[in-house]
Amino acid sequence: MTSLLVGPSYFKDISFLYEDYYKVALDGGYHYFFDNRIRCDLFIGDNDTNDILDLSLADKKIILNRDKDISDSFYAVDYLLDKGFDDFVFLGCLNGRADMNYLSVSLLSYIDKRGGKAVFYNDDEMMYLIKDKKEFDDERGRISLFSLSDESEIEIKNLLYEYEGKLSFDSSLCLSNRIVKPGYIKVKKGRLIAFQQR
């Protein structure tokens, strides 16, 4: 089952809010539902970024203690995984503060380790994990790859820059490649994080 989780960071493309997902507002992300008068299935947060007290557009509410050792997004993912969700789409979690962006990378890795998959969107890019093979058909544009493992073994075929070999965690080797025709990225060992232009 797929869940849409909406965080507080800025984005313009609200079309996702109208699609058939189980919709979760992550604290300040509730503004997007409230401002557009769209119902969400669940609100999760400690209300530290909301100046809206009216949570009437949320069918269910989980109010967290502000003195906690887990982020709203990690709490939500744990809750949803336990409810049987294994596919996650994130909006409003890939802009703004650098530490929150890094948190999203950690969350992407965590979801994978728990058997789920996720894609993070902003208006310009999407971020996702590759651990087997990712094929490209009609997509075009920039893509950057980084190893989430200490060292990954990869094959890049039919992108602007082809490559077969090792990619280490502290390498910029696969920064700013381009999808120019049908091709693929294959991970033989390790895990990659991809930032792909939308």
Feature roles, as predicted:
Residues 61-83:
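Short phosphate-binding loop-to-helix
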Residues 1-54:
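N-terminal beta-strand-loop-alpha-helix module at the start
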Residues 130-198:
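Long, charged alpha-helical interface segments
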Residues 99-109:
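Short Gly/Thr/Asp-enriched flexible loops that form oxyanion-binding sites at enzyme active sites
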Residues 110, 114-137:
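Class I SAM-dependent methyltransferase SAM-binding "motif I" and its flanking Rossmann-like core
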Residues 60, 65, 116-119, 143-144:
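A glycine-rich helix N-cap at a beta->alpha junction
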